Structure formats: structure tokens, C-alpha cells
Regions:
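Catalytic cores of secreted/periplasmic lytic hydrolases that degrade extracellular macromolecules
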Residues: 1-112, 116-170
């Protein structure tokens, strides 16, 4: 319990976030009586996931910069580039566009949207599908909203763990 307990004011001042990763929200998060405690708990769960994803993006960005400067790339590097082009939905071979799109997630915006879309981690989508940001899907892989209009067929994307939701957010 002490490992998870850290002061968000210190995070704001020192910019250090403990690398503690929850795979899902606690089911009893909504039972917390204090709204302030509920919000702090939510931030302590989601913030490290966003920071970790940003670190991964920065690492990938540095790797991409190196590959752009190389005259020849290995088969493994070519495969990595193909995967990143798909991941960021960039047309084949447009590495300059990939570099532009491969950018950090704005932490404050991500936290605000996550809080709103997931009801501070207490929504059905957050609890049943680790869906933090409320991304829609039409391919059948998700959770159907209970009050969806009859003429609609979208679902909310479902994820195996919270980190996957953050990864998909970019």
C-alpha cells in the first residue's frame, strides 16, 4: 500500500511519477466516500500509464530519427518501420509524416479526457473493458452502450489491460 501512496503535489513540482501500473481499475473505486480521494486515486492509476506510454513514444521517435539518417536498414528495422507506419496510419514510406505523428500524448489533455469518458474510472466501460477514453468501434469487438439509439451499431473498444487503452489513445 505504501508503494502506491505518493503525493501528487510532489509529482507536479518534481515531475517524478512512480512506475506503478494497474492492469484494471479497482471495482470498489466508486465506493470511496471522498470525491477528492476518488479523483486522486484515479490520477495515481492513469498518470503512470500515460507517462510510460510517452517514454515508449520518445524511444520510438529516437529510433526513427536514427533510421531516417541511415542509408541502409536491416530486415528487422524495415519490419519495425512497417509496423509503425501501420500503427500511426501513415502512408507507406512517408517517414517524415511518421515522425510528425509519433509525438507524446499531452498528459493534461489525456487525464482530462480519461476522467470525463470513464467517470473517474467508475464507468461500466472502464470496469468491464478497461476503456479509459471511450473510443468507438464498429467491428463488433467492444461493449455495446446500454442506451444506444436503435439505428446505431457502434460499441466502445474493449482492452485486456488499462495500458492498452492508453496505447490506443495516440
Amino acid at each position: 500500500r505504501q508503494d502506491v501512496d505518493y503525493d501528487l503535489r510532489k509529482v507536479r513540482n518534481e515531475k517524478l511519477v512512480k512506475p506503478i501500473y494497474f492492469t484494471q481499475f479497482p471495482r470498489d473505486l466508486d465506493n470511496l466516500q471522498s470525491v477528492q480521494l476518488k479523483k486522486e486515486t484515479f490520477i495515481k492509476i492513469v498518470l503512470p500509464l500515460i507517462v510510460a506510454e510517452n517514454e515508449k513514444i520518445l524511444d520510438d521517435r529516437e529510433k526513427l530519427k536514427v533510421l531516417i539518417e541511415k542509408k541502409f536498414t536491416s530486415d528487422a528495422e524495415k519490419q519495425w518501420l512497417r509496423q509503425k507506419l501501420l500503427e500511426y496510419k501513415v502512408k507507406k514510406g512517408n517517414l517524415d509524416e511518421l515522425l510528425i505523428r509519433m509525438d507524446m500524448i499531452p498528459v493534461s489533455i489525456a487525464l482530462a479526457q480519461a476522467a470525463k469518458e470513464s467517470g473517474w474510472g467508475t464507468s461500466r466501460f472502464a470496469l468491464e473493458g478497461n476503456a479509459i477514453f471511450g473510443q468507438w468501434t464498429w467491428d463488433g469487438q467492444g461493449i455495446a452502450p446500454l442506451k444506444r439509439d436503435g439505428d446505431k451499431n457502434h460499441k466502445i473498444l474493449k482492452f485486456p489491460i488499462l495500458r492498452a487503452s492508453v496505447k490506443a489513445y495516440k
